[in-house]
Every structure is written in structure tokens, then in C-alpha cells.
């Protein structure tokens, strides 16, 4: 099962028949994907599917063995890798960490314009109250937002996020999804990877299901089907509806008995 999006605008990113290997072991094969202005695309798939590798190929940090990644001229790309808790030995404040995006030096003397830009970005991500805190004192979720703020300081046209909701609580996850929707409305394109099907993927407008190659790509409602999920994850899954929301479970027998009576498989619903 494959599906590619059709755009009326010139894409910012055009991935054509991409292949990436580690030695003789293929990581990605025959990947074709386009990203248009204002796109918000989630990449889902099992561990080892190549999600991070695809982001790195788009960011230009690895060289593919086959195919190509074409970027529009003068495209500004922000890339935030998956963040583990930072334990830096040197004392760096949140303000200084974000400022690195403009100065490329840890303790450079900022201009008034740069100070204003940092303050604006920190406020947008609700980090202004933490500006003078050492980054190593923050939680993992707070640190993740700091690195997103640093990427936004460069005013990217395309933002690449690797597992941005990993290790964050429900409230921070909702805040991040709201921020991504705002960035999209501002015209920024966002591509992110996630393992969280129910908490993140179901809330995104577009999904690409990846397992070494793209199994399917398109509107979330058309991609999140039991057939495509099984091809992607190699396991039987059900897509259920509850209270107007889509829920994905491994299999019906794993569903709580009381909950099972209150949900309807979307496949059956669509056949009525």
C-alpha cells in the first residue's frame, strides 16, 4: 500500500527514491516524499523503521546511498534531535542556550535585537519564567522546549522534530501540539517523528507510515486503518471510535471489558 500527496504549491522538500544503508544493511529504501509550505506531517513506525534517519537525510546530516533530497533554494531548516536529559558540566542558562542559535558561541555578547528575539521566542513557548535558570536544572520536557525555541530563533521555513513529545507529560504534549498548529498557521512546515499513535499521531493532519519504506502517506483519517497499521507494525491493530475520537488498540482482546462495549470499529462503521 503506497500513497503520495499531490500539491498545488512547489514543495519545499522533494525526496525522490531515497536509499540509506549502514554497511550492507538497508535502513531506508525507495523513499519518496514531498513537503509543501504549511504542511504538518507526522512520521510513525516501529523502532528501527528509519524515522530518525529520514529526518537526518532531509536535514542534510547524512548522505544517502541512493536517490536524492531536493530542497527549495534558500530554505531555512531547523532540526531538533531527540533530546535526552542534559547534564552539562558548565553553567548555561536557558537564555544563553537559545541565544546560541544566533551567535554560535556559548557566551557571546548579544545585541538588543537578539535579546528581544530570544525574549519573544521564550514567551511563545512559555519559557520566559525560566530564562535565567540553568538548563541542567530543567525537566526533560522543559529542555525539549528550550531546544525547539533555539531552532525557532533562526526563523526556519521547515522545522524537523525527532520525537518531540518523548518523556513529556500530557499537559506539555497538548501545549506542543497547539504550538505546532500555530506554526503551521503561520506558514511554517513541520515534520516530526513519534511513537505515540493515540496521543500525537491521531491529532496530526497528515501521516506517513514508515517501515524501511513508506507504507502509506496522506490524510490521517485515510492512513490510520487496520490494514496499513498491520503492514507498518507487523501486528494486528484495531482503529476504534470513542466520543468522536480515534483510538488504536493492539487487538480487541486487549481492550478493557467495560470499554469494549462503548467503542465501534471504524471499518464496520464505514461499511454501513
State where each predicted segment sits.
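Conserved ABC ATPase signature
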Residues: 134-138, 142
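Helix-to-loop junction immediately C-terminal to a conserved catalytic motif
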Residues: 59
